[in-house]
């Protein structure tokens, strides 16, 4: 998951940084740090990245990692 994917995923489901932090059980500064990295969400542990990803995927976000990494909503 890239920082851009994380920002886009949040925007796609209209989730604030504070709400994502709360649901993932991490601090708001942690979410901000993840989203500010230019390439990858490498500023935090793999465990923290997984917590965030689980929340986003539970809301229907699907991460795409082809030639152009992105996000989309899963079809119901």
Outline where the language-model segments fall.
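Recognition helix of helix-turn-helix/homeodomain-like DNA-binding domains
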Residues: 26-44
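DNA major-groove recognition helix of helix-turn-helix/homeodomain DNA-binding modules
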Residues: 46-64
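Helix-turn-helix/homeodomain-like alpha-helical modules used for DNA recognition
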Residues: 61-76
